[in-house]
Amino acid sequence: MTKHIIVIGGGLGGISAAIRMAQSGYSVSLYEQNTHIGGKVNRHESDGFGFDLGPSILTMPYIFEKLFEYSKKQMSDYVTIKRLPHQWRSFFPDGTTIDLYEGIKETGQHNAILSKQDIEELQNYLNYTRRIDRITEKGYFNYGLDTLSQIIKFHGPLNALINYDYVHTMQQAIDKRISNPYLRQMLGYFIKYVGSSSYDAPAVLSMLFHMQQEQGLWYVEGGIHHLANALEKLAREEGVTIHTGARVDNIKTYQRRVTGVRLDTGEFVKADYIISNMEVIPTYKYLIHLDTQRLNKLEREFEPASSGYVMHLGVACQYPQLAHHNFFFTENAYLNYQQVFHEKVLPDDPTIYLVNTNKTDHTQAPVGYENIKVLPHIPYIQDQPFTTEDYAKFRDKILDKLEKMGLTDLRKHIIYEDVWTPEDIEKNYRSNRGAIYGVVADKKKNKGFKFPKESQYFENLYFVGGSVNPGGGMPMVTLSGQQVADKINAREAKNRK
């Protein structure tokens, strides 16, 4: 008899797992509480402006392409992606700007401010991150390794210690090789992909720089939601039964097994395996009602990553100095990280990520206007949450900073505004305390590891998404779905022997 897989949540991890399980011959049912597939890969359109509500950067497209190739299909027949050789522009408080290009040579050619020594150091750092990326790919990505002990067993103790560089934090690894203060801050903020602090995260995450340099930075034409739509279409073609507007209220358990799910309609659906794309702690807390002692232990080790204050602005003017992707950096990177990740307060001078897709795709705003998405990282929801007044003051702080750093009269030109707070993120995606990136990467707390993909409490329960390895970001959560499918396939093959 064909075994039945239930997938809870249609984010990229969930839809990826569903596709691979269906491709492997299982009966698959996916339940998504929202009316769209893609999770945080969401879309907002109003007054002629289009915004990607969630991720705005596509990297490592080969991970997505593999899903189509398993079905002997081409992703290019489903969605169009465009490479962006000019990856982003960095603005600094003293007026300095640095343009990051795909390729160290190209970055040097486009930035007269960078010296020969700067470029040599940048190349040296890229070589260092390449070594980490290569060894990470062998075990962490290709075999879905989940713990430090698995890493050590796979690679050997000395090889793992040296090549994963578990001695240093990410920022220490950067500062050891880079002397230019602007480059130090820019490279440190690659940690944005996982919503953590470069001063706390292990140096292994330096590989994020090499990933982007080698694999490129891409734009999904028409908006990144088209990628989720493509995956949904592939899933349906492979026979996945997708239920949207369907909320799972409870996971039924018996001893050390999960037996099925109870929907908000009261219907019970049996399962041989359950794959949860809901974050690990909310799954245990709200769907399984795990005891407080075990929950508290998990919460101490796997703290949420950062959230964000997300502004979607329709602007009745154009700012020619903006690139597609932009970063407006803080005066004091260390203080910014401290306030967000340790003091848990709204930062005084946040680093701001600003996306202006209209620079590449003119269909995203009316002629002569621009669509601007603004995202500074802020703490996840605290026991005493920030108030409406707190957020209003923070909004003013953001706009003050952007105007001061060159976006003249931005306030006057805003004709449309939509804002998402951590509370909105938690409500819409059931994320843990409104975190955007799952679990924080912290060298001391968890060695940079997220939750394992296999439940430690229930033998046929698996997890995908940003709260499990290999981590947050679109390619990683998509890869987690493929890795879980591989684990279930391997287990079933072993059972048949």
UniProtKB/Swiss-Prot annotation:
EC annotation from Swiss-Prot or TrEMBL: 1.14.99.-
Organism: Staphylococcus aureus (strain N315)
General function of this protein: Involved in the biosynthesis of the yellow-orange carotenoid staphyloxanthin, which plays a role in the virulence via its protective function against oxidative stress. Catalyzes the oxidation of the terminal methyl side group of 4,4'-diaponeurosporene to form 4,4'-diaponeurosporen-4-al.
Family statement: Belongs to the carotenoid/retinoid oxidoreductase family. CrtP subfamily.
Protein name: 4,4'-diaponeurosporene oxygenase
Binding site for FAD: 7-19
Highest taxon, organism lineage: Bacteria
Keywords: Carotenoid biosynthesis, FAD, Flavoprotein, Oxidoreductase, Virulence
